[in-house]
Amino acid sequence: MKTIVIVDLQKDFYDPKGSLYVSGAETFPSRIAALVPEYDNVYFTLDWHPLNHCSFKQNGGIWPVHCLKYSWGASLPDEVLAAVDASRQHISYYHKGDRSYEEEYEAYRKITDNQLRLLKNSDEIAVCGLCGDYCVGLTIKRLIELGLKDRIVVLKDCTGSIDDGSTLEGIISENKLKTR
């Protein structure tokens, strides 16, 4: 069984009009949509912030307001959702950063037994999305902590970073992860 974890592929990150747009990320939805049929399970992780989130500059954090719950910026690309619907895979959503007082870059900090079982039953866990130097990289580290290192494949051409990509490359190299 193969699982793809699509990290924070939300309009505020991939759309040039988004508040935290990552250069070049507008090409990711079509690339990821083309890959979706290869996988049995699709996990979307979502930044899912309240307006008073601690990470926002107006509240003492470092980021502009982004990915507000139920907003345009928090939404997923239609073409990826259509690909999932057409392929009829098992789909799951993981909301993070949804408590105003807590920053949460990585997915699976609050993993359920069912989520962990699904991941452990996967022969391959492909990881892609935004941003490699924050949420993608820390999600990979969390998957490693959960004992899933040998199953991880980083989809580099579907992953963008705020930095020059060196943080994610360091995580890949340090952990000898597979890439595609």
What are these model-derived regions, one by one?
Residues K2-V5, Q10-Y14, G24-N41, P50, ...:
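Active-site-adjacent betaalpha module
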